[in-house]
């Protein structure tokens, strides 16, 4: 019989291998030669596991390797290596000669970055795979034999379980193996199937197909190598040497077949007899085993009873210990309580004495309190009078403050809510160097009058609220504007803006320089000073925002990215206007305000033209929000101050701008014109005020109308070169103020008239373009009027609701008056109750005195009772001591019982060991007798076979006998292997086929030499007989399964395994299969 060879490179467990095996090919334990004994141990189990691992491979030369590819495993015979789904960059950089993954049909690519355990020197191979039902076609190969290696790794279902991915691998449309990677090596571990032999025909094609059984197949790499040439062993022929002439006599095939048939029949008879004996011995062993199990069960029962008794004894010990501890704790508590009560009695005596002293003191204090009650009533009355005076003063102060605000704002209104101040700058260095003439007359500046020489000594005069000469400084200018600041703190909206042509000093007036501050800085400074003066009565919260209107677009100058979002004007529910998303900086002092102003001025849009190199091309607007809360009455106000530095207003012809600058100038002039229209409509109290004609006026809507106050600085130039712009600025200011003084009539200059006509024509052209925009605005106005009508309807409905609410308020007011009358009556009744309570207080004082006397008597009685309790507790302690003595006697008795039980347990253990030793000796003797009988029978069978069936060998020499027996035994062993041995591996099958092929070749050669024709096929009737004679297999192993018969075998016989059992170390249960009526030993 051939020995089973197991590869050491496949250390897999039995559970993982059995899941990979096909249900048609179950696994069995291995059986060695007939003369070898089978023993139970770790080595036999490991051999079985390895054999089951290799049973999944059809090719006996192939093997499974649970580690990755290494440099030492590389060979020069590699023809092609394909990394399935691999990255081209890793493929080119690797040491392997890896081909591109272009030979597949179907499937998907999957890659992972997880580390692969034991991946060898090329771990990237197992980090990519092809998944799905697919195939590979390797073409352009030379005919011959090749070796294919498959690289697998489970990188998808890393948490299992076993059997979640099972698939078949077909090579040249023949099933090679059935895989479950996770059950063999687990997740993120490589598994290699190497040395799979494949034959390439003339078409030069190898087709590898992957087909899923459960889940999708997965492969990481395919390696194709040249197959080494296998040397064919020489076949030996069967001959017999003669004793006399030493010639080799060939045995004919027919005679050899007859000899084998006879030996086969005799061996079958002997095997039947041995199988009967074997069944008889197994029955005896089964009975012995049943008796052993019953003895073990009795022993277990005794042990259980013994354990219960030991547990009861231990529980009794624990209860006794716990009770003893309880007694000790009770005695300790008694001693502690005794000490505690002694100390408590002493403390009570001390407290009684202290209470007596306190009682005397309280009685004295009670007399003093009774005497001091009239004085307390007088003091309460005085305090109430002071509180009422304080409340009257607060009310008068709030009324006086409101009147002061009204008077102050009335004075400001008498001066005009819309006030216009005119300021003229001095001549600059360029104008003085060219000796430019001054056209402004400041003779009536104190009265607010101003004269402008227009030409031909004609003079045009204007009147404003205040006129500043070039000699007036920033302090003089702010002195007239400072009253407006107080109005902001009183809750009014104020707007201060500077208007004029480019280069007239608007920015200087509003912002100034660090050495000479402007209106903006001085206004905020005064806001903080007044707020600091009023901090005891009013709290203020001031926030600042800086923005600009550039080309009719609002830009936030404090935002980090001004152009990132578009800002729009929204109207809130209370009617005020605000810009959502605008940055508001909360400021606490003037330094923070200056930093905010500097940041806004640096971000402002500036451009150059013919008039000024640094002309402001946008309207810079500083918004100051003031929130005030009156700490006296809780009134809250919210006001807004706008400080606006308007862009330069100049004529387009003079600036000579084009492109983007022309668009900027047109937008500036349009917004300034809209501002003039709004202010003029406010001054004339027009029914419609066009706030929405420009973003500038729309922003200033809250600070231009209603109770708001407006101050305008008109900036002019004294130079004769700027006379037209100066007149246009003064006309605009006069239009704003609503007062225009007629000019002194003198001789008219015709040249000037012609210039004016040309300007009129240009104005007409501009007006045409404006008319178109006006039409669009009218359409928008009509739409707004439709919306206003809807709002009017809603307003009417709200008015009706207000009337209903007023009626409800009247009814509630009447009810409150009635409740007030009821409350007055209740107050009178409460006064009467207070007088009654005073009388009750006196009565309670008398009762207190009586209670003190009774309590002192009761305390004395309690002290006596406590002394009696102490005496009783001393008596109870004696009783507890007697109980402790009784418990100690019981403990001694229980200890004696426990010693008796221990002695009985020892006796039982000695008896149990004696019985076990006797039974083990009997079983060993029986097993040895069975082994001796089997050996004798085997020797007897061999002697009978040699003497009866081969008489011609008796006269041969020893060498001839050896050769003859070798040849005959070779055939007999083949027959026995075909009939008696269970195959457990595909390797044994292939080796069996090789031996059969060699026999057939020898027969053919002998037939060709002798010229005789023989029928080498087996008789089908014999096969049927052999199958009928064979009994069902009886296998004594860990797992019992049916097996697939080998291709060359006709029947199978059972094989018994002998095992040595150590009863002292382990207990083996007995299992009976009642349906098949077989008795089987299983571990």
Swiss-Prot record:
Q: Where is the composition biased (Polar residues)?
A: 971-985, 1044-1054
> Keywords for this entry?
ATP-binding, Coiled coil, Microtubule, Motor protein, Nucleotide-binding
Gene Ontology biological process terms, A to Z: microtubule-based movement
Q: Where is the composition biased (Basic and acidic residues)?
A: 1020-1032, 1062-1083
GO cellular component, as recorded? microtubule; nucleus
Q: Which intervals hold domain Kinesin motor?
A: 417-739
One GO MF term attached to the UniProt entry: microtubule binding
CDD domains xref list: KISc_C_terminal
Ranges where the record places region Disordered: 967-1083
Annotated ATP binding sites: 500-507
Coiled-coil intervals:
264-418, 746-876, 905-947
Task: Please report which protein family the annotation says this sequence is part of.
Answer: Belongs to the TRAFAC class myosin-kinesin ATPase superfamily. Kinesin family. KIN-14 subfamily.
Q: What is this protein called?
A: Kinesin-like protein KIN-14R
Q: What is the lineage of its organism?
A: Eukaryota, Viridiplantae, Streptophyta, Embryophyta, Tracheophyta
